Amino acid sequence: MDLSLLFWIYLINSVILINHEIDSAYWQEWKLVNPNDTSDVKGFLIIHFPMLFAILFGLILIDRGLIAGYVISLIVAAGGIFAFFFHFYHLRKGRKEFNNWLSKLILILTFPISIFQIALTIMDLI
């Protein structure tokens, strides 16, 4: 089995981002956008079914060398970069969510791995 470097970086980034999403449920991430939101986790979980399916399906498509996999790879990596900036913006504003060493480590790891994933995706496409 000859798996590309992109496959492994995508897999690593996906595991990190999925762990971030687990952490997001703990911190009730939806309240970062709307602090007055009194809803519970149900809506948050529902939107994660298609999101996690797309992330995992994208890995299969990358393994098969399909263009859709490369598109999903770029979207997943962009999501990692967005998560990094979104959460550190809120941390700098004094929010308590994600303010522990493991939550921060997960976010910090997403940034360089996502940049590397974008670079590998583009290099594989050209």
What are these regions (language model features)?
Residues 22-40:
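Cytosolic, membrane-interface loops and tails of multi-pass inner-membrane proteins
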Residues 2-13, 68-76:
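Interfacial segments of alpha-helical transmembrane regions
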Residues 116-126:
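Juxtamembrane boundary at the C-terminal end of a transmembrane helix
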